[in-house]
Amino acid sequence: MGLERDGILSQDLHFNEVFVSLWQNKLTRYEIARVISARALQLAMGAPALIDINNISLTDVISIAEEEFKRGVLPITIRRRLPNGKIILLSLRKS
């Protein structure tokens, strides 16, 4: 019984490592929604846009925040805490 349990634990650990490596540089839909809503709030409170909004037909703050996110100009870093205690920092700014 102990050997079966060790085999299952090692498979679970391997699965967790693969899962973490796959999702390490991707954002979840909830993280994306949180970033866009936080940036839209900043824009609504008077923060300057990080893209030139004169050349595009975007007028509402959510569309502007989405466009800034798509272009990768947001100076925001996501701190993701993993179940094993590790912390991963994901920068949204594309170089």
From Swiss-Prot:
<dbReference type="GO" id="GO:0006360">
    <property type="term" value="P:transcription by RNA polymerase I"/>
</dbReference>
<dbReference type="GO" id="GO:0003677">
    <property type="term" value="F:DNA binding"/>
</dbReference>
<keyword id="KW-0963">Cytoplasm</keyword>
<comment type="function">
    <text>DNA-dependent RNA polymerase (RNAP) catalyzes the transcription of DNA into RNA using the four ribonucleoside triphosphates as substrates.</text>
</comment>
<dbReference type="GO" id="GO:0042797">
    <property type="term" value="P:tRNA transcription by RNA polymerase III"/>
</dbReference>
<dbReference type="GO" id="GO:0003899">
    <property type="term" value="F:DNA-directed RNA polymerase activity"/>
</dbReference>
<protein>
    <recommendedName>
        <fullName>DNA-directed RNA polymerase subunit Rpo6</fullName>
        <ecNumber>2.7.7.6</ecNumber>
    </recommendedName>
</protein>
<comment type="similarity">
    <text>Belongs to the archaeal Rpo6/eukaryotic RPB6 RNA polymerase subunit family.</text>
</comment>
<comment type="subunit">
    <text>Part of the RNA polymerase complex.</text>
</comment>
<dbReference type="InterPro" id="IPR036161">
    <property type="entry name" value="RPB6/omega-like_sf"/>
</dbReference>
<keyword id="KW-0240">DNA-directed RNA polymerase</keyword>
<dbReference type="InterPro" id="IPR006111">
    <property type="entry name" value="Rpo6/Rpb6"/>
</dbReference>
<dbReference type="GO" id="GO:0000428">
    <property type="term" value="C:DNA-directed RNA polymerase complex"/>
</dbReference>
<dbReference type="InterPro" id="IPR006110">
    <property type="entry name" value="Pol_omega/Rpo6/RPB6"/>
</dbReference>
<dbReference type="GO" id="GO:0006366">
    <property type="term" value="P:transcription by RNA polymerase II"/>
</dbReference>
<dbReference type="InterPro" id="IPR020708">
    <property type="entry name" value="DNA-dir_RNA_polK_14-18kDa_CS"/>
</dbReference>
<keyword id="KW-0804">Transcription</keyword>
<keyword id="KW-0808">Transferase</keyword>
<keyword id="KW-0548">Nucleotidyltransferase</keyword>
<dbReference type="Pfam" id="PF01192">
    <property type="entry name" value="RNA_pol_Rpb6"/>
</dbReference>
<dbReference type="GO" id="GO:0005737">
    <property type="term" value="C:cytoplasm"/>
</dbReference>
